[in-house]
């Protein structure tokens, strides 16, 4: 028997260089974004969700880490990897983000900045789940 991994879903766990040095700046950046737009937008969330963000000094550090990973990793043959947008979410106890996908995105990522004890988990489900149900 031959097994062909036709539609694999890879999840990469990548460390951001100097993350400890920028964590406080990230939290300040997020707080400033929320103060500037306290209502935010509603997508898949019950908490606060920012507008799409394109750039900023703190986001540049995150972008650099991602670009370095994808352009230097032999697993992918990606030329000129580019981060095209970011969103910020801030959830209070009881807030959620429902299961969702990112149409048109070749890759998506999460940077978990602060999680109080007894918080919920980040869960991933197969993007091919529609193939698992009989119609």
Place the predicted regions along the sequence by residue.
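Non-heme Fe(II)/2-oxoglutarate
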Residues: 1-79
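A generic structural micro-feature
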Residues: 6, 80, 101-105
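Catalytic core of non-heme Fe(II) oxygenases with the double-stranded beta-helix
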Residues: 85-135
């Amino acid at each position: 028997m031959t097994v062909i991994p036709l539609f694999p879903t890879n999840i990469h766990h990548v460390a951001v260089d100097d993350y400890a040095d920028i964590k406080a700046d990230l939290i300040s950046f997020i707080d400033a974004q929320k103060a500037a737009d306290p209502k935010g937008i509603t997508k898949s969330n019950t908490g606060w969700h920012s507008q799409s963000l394109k750039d900023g000094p703190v986001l540049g550090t995150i972008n650099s880490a991602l670009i370095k990973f994808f352009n230097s990793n032999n697993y992918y043959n990606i030329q000129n990897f580019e981060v095209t947008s970011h969103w910020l979410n801030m959830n209070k106890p009881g807030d959620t983000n429902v299961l969702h996908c990112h149409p048109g995105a070749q890759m998506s990522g999460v940077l978990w900045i602060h999680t109080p004890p007894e918080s919920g988990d980040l869960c991933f489900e197969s993007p091919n789940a529609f193939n698992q149900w009989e119609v």
